């Protein structure tokens, strides 16, 4: 049984795959925050900007089997050209639910499988693109992948600690919220002073897509 908040077709708005057409499969639940506002300040991740609670989003629900969920994702793919299909498994924390059987069903339908994870749970074999976004001082198990995205700034977190990890791309993303303008200035300054890092923006918010 898979609990899914929403499934929708859009453009990837962040990171090295920015601009690529994708079906987003947002799983319900997270191991770093309940999703309830009354728990935010005490959560291991208190700056999340995503609603991952429940199954009431577009195409959300309880999916009984890997094939039923993969079919629901496939139905959202609107392109009929020869481009490789792409599904982004996100959350919440997708690795609480994503497993090898579901990955195999996605592959059977011609999808590359990407995940956006906090890195606290090992990645199943078969995932094609791994994006890890460390949160605060939470221990990270996944120290290799395709890209590391650090929301910045985070109290007491020095980005340099991550540069020894095995990732192809390192992104600094300004923390959203009331201080987003200041955080953007700080992120730009940091990237100019530390050019191994690239500035990562949430372009889907800039252009007004989901």
Regions found by a protein language model. Give the residues of each.
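Generic secondary-structure boundary/loop-capping signal
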Residues: 1, 8, 200-204
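Short loop segments at secondary-structure junctions
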Residues: 28-30, 135
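N-terminal nucleotide/polyanion-binding subdomain common to many enzyme families
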Residues: 1-5, 16, 28
């Amino acid at each position: 049984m898979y609990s899914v908040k929403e499934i929708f077709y859009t453009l990837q708005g962040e990171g090295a795959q920015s601009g690529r057409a994708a079906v987003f499969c947002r799983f319900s639940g997270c191991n770093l925050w309940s999703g309830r506002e009354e728990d935010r300040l005490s959560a291991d991740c208190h700056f999340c900007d995503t609603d991952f609670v429940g199954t009431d989003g577009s195409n959300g629900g309880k999916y009984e089997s890997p094939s039923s969920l993969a079919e629901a994702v496939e139905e959202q793919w609107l392109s009929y050209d020869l481009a490789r299909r792409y599904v982004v498994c996100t959350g919440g924390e997708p690795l609480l639910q994503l497993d090898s059987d579901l990955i195999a069903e996605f592959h059977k339908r011609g999808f590359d499988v990407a995940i956006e994870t906090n890195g606290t749970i090992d990645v199943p074999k078969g995932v094609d693109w791994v994006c890890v976004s460390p949160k605060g001082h939470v221990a990270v198990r996944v120290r290799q992948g395709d890209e590391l995205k650090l929301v910045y700034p985070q109290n007491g977190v020095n980005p340099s600690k991550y540069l020894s990890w095995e990732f192809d791309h390192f992104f600094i993303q300004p923390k959203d919220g009331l201080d987003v303008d200041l955080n953007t200035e700080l992120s730009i300054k940091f990237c100019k002073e530390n050019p191994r890092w690239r500035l990562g923006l949430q372009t889907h918010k800039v252009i007004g897509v989901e």
